């Protein structure tokens, strides 16, 4: 008797609208294999209409405990357009250490109110395009531990996540990202964003990046946030009416020239913070650059100066 092959597969129960991911040797007839490359998963053609997009049928997703032994390489489009999806169970059994694409993974899951991706291993992911886009009912999302060092595309990543009141992207490594088109557009409940670690030297498109963030008051950024590679007509700050940085918001000035903390809408925060020290002694001033490196003397540009129990920023021209 031949041993059965252990494999990853997905079962769709149309009656209950439940999509179950498993990894064992008991793949039943009619089960689907995981998708590869940029292809839509096979369960869409079965659950949805002729376009291949599922809109109404999938209501629940379950990752069986057996799926903990699976090592998918691609999660793109897994749940895109699942407008009636309200719960995902067993997400802790999804090991993403070998995944390279999370493109549109949860996009347009408009009735999903909670999503725990805090255990995701994303060190090999290159594509996060539209990953959470239009998840308009999400009230919390923990992406604080995401390793984004290899990501190149963050277009639409949080687009229209209108019920998120906070979003911690302070540790995102964006040095390889080339596009952030409408990345935070329509995040109308956010009041602040910490982008102090964002290195945008390779980003060529930031169009609409913060468009419609109507309650966003503060964007923290460092010298690593630059727009030198973006086109001149890159309108970044449309309808950010509460935003205040070095200057208050002006609806007639929404372009890339306002993406700075000296004459624009950003508020300075060093990428590597230098904490203030407390002392009762008289001490000489110490100088650091914005990355926390000790200097022998002030240099041109922004300097961090520590003197006694005070830490201040000094711009040397």
Question: Across the structure, where does each feature detected by a protein language model lie?
Answer:
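Negatively charged
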Residues: 2-271
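Short solvent-exposed loop/turn micro-motifs enriched in small/polar/acidic residues
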Residues: 4-5, 279-280, 298
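A short beta-strand micro-motif
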Residues: 10-11, 287, 305
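Short, ordered coil/turn segments that flank beta-strands lining enzyme active or ligand-binding pockets
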Residues: 15, 290-292, 307
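Residue-level detector of functionally pivotal "anchor" positions at catalytic/ligand-binding pockets or at interdomain
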Residues: 269-291
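A glycine-anchored, Pro-Gly-centered beta-turn/N-cap motif
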Residues: 299-303
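C-terminal tail/sorting-segment detector
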Residues: 304-317
């Amino acid at each position: 008797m031949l041993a059965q092959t252990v494999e990853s597969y997905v079962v769709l129960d149309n009656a209950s609208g439940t999509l179950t991911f498993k990894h064992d040797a008991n793949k039943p007839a009619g089960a689907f294999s995981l998708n590869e490359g940029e292809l839509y998963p096979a369960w869409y053609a079965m659950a949805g209409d002729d376009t291949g997009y599922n809109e109404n049928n999938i209501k629940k997703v379950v990752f069986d405990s057996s799926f903990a032994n699976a090592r998918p390489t691609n999660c793109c489009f897994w749940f895109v357009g699942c407008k009636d999806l309200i719960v995902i169970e067993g997400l802790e059994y999804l090991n993403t250490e070998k995944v390279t694409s999370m493109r549109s993974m949860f996009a347009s899951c408009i009735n999903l109110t909670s999503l725990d991706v805090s255990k995701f291993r994303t060190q090999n992911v290159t594509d996060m395009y539209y990953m959470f886009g239009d998840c308009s009912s999400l009230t919390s999302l923990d992406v604080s531990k995401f390793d984004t060092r290899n990501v190149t595309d963050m277009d639409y990543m949080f687009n229209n996540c209108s019920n998120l009141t906070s979003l911690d992207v302070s540790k995102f490594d964006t040095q390889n990202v080339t596009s952030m088109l409408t990345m935070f557009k329509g995040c109308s409940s956010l009041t602040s964003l910490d982008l102090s670690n964002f290195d945008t030297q390779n980003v060529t498109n930031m169009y609409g990046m913060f468009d419609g963030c109507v309650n966003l008051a503060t964007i923290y950024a460092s010298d690593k946030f630059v727009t030198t590679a973006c086109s001149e007509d890159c309108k970044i700050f449309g309808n950010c009416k509460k935003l205040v940085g070095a200057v208050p918001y002006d609806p007639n000035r929404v372009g890339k020239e306002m993406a700075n903390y000296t004459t624009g809408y950003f508020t300075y925060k060093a990428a590597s913070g230098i904490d203030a020290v407390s002392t009762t002694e008289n001490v000489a001033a110490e100088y650091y650059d914005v990355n926390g490196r000790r200097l022998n003397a002030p240099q041109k540009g922004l300097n961090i100066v520590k003197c006694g129990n005070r830490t201040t920023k000094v711009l040397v021209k």
